[in-house]
Amino acid sequence: LVLANYPNKDGRLANGVGLDTPASAVHVMTLLLEAHYDVQELPANSAALMAQIMAGPTNWLTDRAERSGGETLPLVDYLAQYQTLPYALRTRIEERWGDPSSDPFFEPTTATAVGGFKLSILRFGNISLGLQPARGYNIDPTETYHSPDLVPPHNYLAFYFWLRNSQGAHAVVHLGKHGNLEWLPGKALALSEECLPEAILGPMPHIYPFIVNDPGEGTQAKRRTQAVIIDHLTPPLTRAETYGPLRDLEALVDEYYEAAGIDPRRINYLRREILTLTATSGLDKDIGFQGEEAGDLAKLDAYLCDLKEAQIRDGLHIFGQTPEGQQLRDLTIALARIPRGNGKGGDASLLRAMADDLQLAFDPLDCDLSVQWEGPTPPSLACLSDDVWRSNGDTVERLELLAQHLMEATAQAPGEKSSAVMAKICDSIAPTLAQCGPMEGEGLLTALAGQFVSPAPSGAPTRGRLDVLPTGRNFYSVDSRAVPTPTAWALGWKSANLLI
């Protein structure tokens, strides 16, 4: 199991986009143990795993020499494998990084140890877990991670030489988007022996758990490192809402607009309080206050409304596990929040369906949240919150709260349209979502068994692409069913007619 480390600091160990990589690594090893792989001394949890990683050598050079543990590839073994590389490739590496013994990750021979490369690798029986090396040292990692011409240093090669030959690994799993192996110099397709990904990884079976909404970079791994993708869910989403100073500001703004035209003295006091709190929190700069109190207050109100209803991540996904509890509820609502397919019947937006059933006469997905609400205030929404009901945003908030109650079966759908969407959620969306965790684990074990992993489309499930679920499959980037698009077909038809 190879974990990414970008940038190569200890504060960024085991980072993967949208993935709780340490917890995922522990869960993957648990799955391997249950599948009768030889897994020994399994860490109790992600914290225990990270403590083990931090206790040993990492990519952070500062105090590396003071850390014990890890695996060592003796220089003699390294040179034996290094000499098998094409001469032109070795020349490029040595011109950039010098000879192997000059690498800062190389430890010379001492009275008690043979000289070699100290590697960031832990062993758990037949399962090894390592930190992918950086693409170089004394360089800016943010500028070189995707560099098309920077050859890797000797310690990088030593890491993969150890996996392939010293451990004799049967497969490598790069856990989470994304590592740097697939970005090493070489051809984009049909790699040769002088292309770094091919020279380093060789014919090793390569399994790559990868976030389902990024087919572009996943395709890079497929083309350049023969990766079998096992796609995984995006992080669970929820409403941002407001808290702390933002919650205080929201209450003050609501009170301000309630007092408008009624109590001028209270308005002046509230205005000062609002502007002071905004300046203290730094929001005045974020929002772009112009020094015009009325205009600035309107900007603040719009900002708070937009922020409150924004969809944000609620934690990270753990590979092989479906979200539970509130995370599962909120993610299900996020999947049904926007229309899917033709946007009709069960594929309609849940929020729009509820708004139509309640005869609110507005679009909750496409409205100015800060505009004053002038529509009806049905009791089924009014009872859900004691907060002021003043703006479109307050109406959307109550629709979101009603959706939560519908998911928890503590309220009934307000009408025919929302009933159709809820039926689709119960019959299709929720069961499919529940399959994601188990299928991710099953997909990984299937790949490790050398068996076929089913293909699937890719994309963001929270943007209407429910066809990418369940995850745990080998995604592709271009869906042949969607090619050509109607526009492309129309233009092609016109071009053909002009040619004829």
What annotation goes with each model-predicted range?
Residues 2-500:
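Ligand/cofactor-recognition surfaces for anionic moieties
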